[in-house]
């Protein structure tokens, strides 16, 4: 059985597509690594790339991406709405299949040490890979951002890195590497440019200040769109789903005469999270994920993916036809028609 992990490196560049292309090219050139998604945001001046593959291959891709970011990004000239301490700011490893969170911790520690060895970029470990309890939360590591950390590392032992010298790389800063469960980056945009309203809402909904469990949030100003945004990380969407967070943001916004005008998901999201949201807002009675066509087809195909790399289903035709021919109620005529049409 293949061992699969995900890595979601965040880079402090969201305005120069050529630089992001070069970073992605460095990572995608590693055999066995798949670039599943890339997001750029000019206001945040940040890119989020989603990689998946076998652990060693993904680790090497993350290392090469860090090296290319070090070449191309100068934090002394960087501005953006999102907090950052490094050119290759954050690199979490997430278990997918045949891999435990402990495996990802070991991989994160290995990658962190190798980043220092290759590039002389100091390393902080966070989440499950944290070496100190106060560094479990990323916001504690990023406090003061690049500029503040640059000064504090020289004189404050509590702000010194887990790996490397107590001195930031002059242009690439530091990198924060960790291991965690799947996280949903979910942002809600408001019909106001008043950042203080977004900050108040963020404070009300985040767990650290008495809000919803498994929620981290902050207010962000989107100058290019003349909007304020509540930027949210959901660390356990099954316990605190997206729809619950959206409804609380909406309720809190009403207190200040504001309202959501849209929301966005940054990166990838589990299908189950969207099913839960649809179930809630449509008020479906006795809904089961088995009613979703793609879920039923995947079951019939023995868990095979719904699409090949080229987006076609041709490679799955034989097991599907065998399932249709079997003496069972599903998949039925409607499913067969849908498959044929594809």
Located regions from the model:
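Long, contiguous binding/interaction regions
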Residues: 1-322, 326-327
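Glycine/serine-rich anion-binding loops at beta->alpha junctions
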Residues: 325-342
């Amino acid at each position: 059985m293949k061992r699969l992990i995900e890595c979601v490196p965040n880079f402090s560049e969201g305005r120069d597509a050529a630089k992001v292309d070069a970073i992605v090219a460095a990572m995608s050139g590693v055999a066995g690594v798949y670039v599943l998604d890339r997001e750029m945001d000019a206001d945040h001046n940040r890119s989020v790339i989603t990689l998946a593959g076998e652990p060693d291959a993904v680790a090497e891709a993350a290392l090469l991406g860090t090296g290319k970011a070090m070449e191309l990004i100068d934090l002394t000239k960087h501005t953006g709405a999102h907090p950052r301490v490094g050119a290759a700011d954050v690199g979490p490893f997430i278990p997918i299949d045949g891999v435990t969170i402990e495996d990802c911790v070991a991989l994160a520690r290995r990658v962190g040490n190798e980043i220092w060895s290759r590039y002389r970029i100091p390393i902080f470990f966070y989440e499950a890979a944290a070496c100190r309890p106060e560094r479990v939360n990323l916001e504690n590591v990023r406090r003061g951002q690049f500029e503040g950390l640059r000064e504090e590392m020289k004189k404050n032992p509590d702000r010194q890195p887990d790996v490397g010298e107590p001195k930031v790389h002059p242009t690439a800063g530091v990198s924060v590497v960790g291991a965690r469960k799947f996280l949903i980056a979910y942002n809600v945009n408001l019909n106001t440019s008043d950042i203080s309203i977004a900050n108040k809402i963020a404070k009300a909904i985040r767990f650290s200040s008495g809000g919803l469990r498994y929620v981290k949030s902050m207010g962000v100003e989107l100058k290019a769109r003349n909007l304020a945004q509540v930027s949210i990380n959901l660390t356990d969407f099954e316990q605190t789903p997206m729809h619950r967070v959206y409804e609380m943001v909406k309720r809190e916004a009403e207190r200040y005469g504001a309202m959501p005008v849209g929301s966005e998901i940054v990166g990838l999201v589990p299908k189950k999270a969207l099913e839960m949201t649809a179930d809630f807002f449509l008020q479906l009675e006795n809904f089961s994920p088995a009613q979703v066509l793609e879920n039923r087809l995947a079951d019939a195909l023995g868990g095979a993916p719904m699409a090949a790399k080229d987006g076609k289903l041709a490679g799955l035709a034989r097991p599907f036809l065998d399932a249709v021919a079997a003496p069972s109620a599903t998949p039925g005529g409607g499913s067969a028609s849908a498959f044929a049409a594809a």
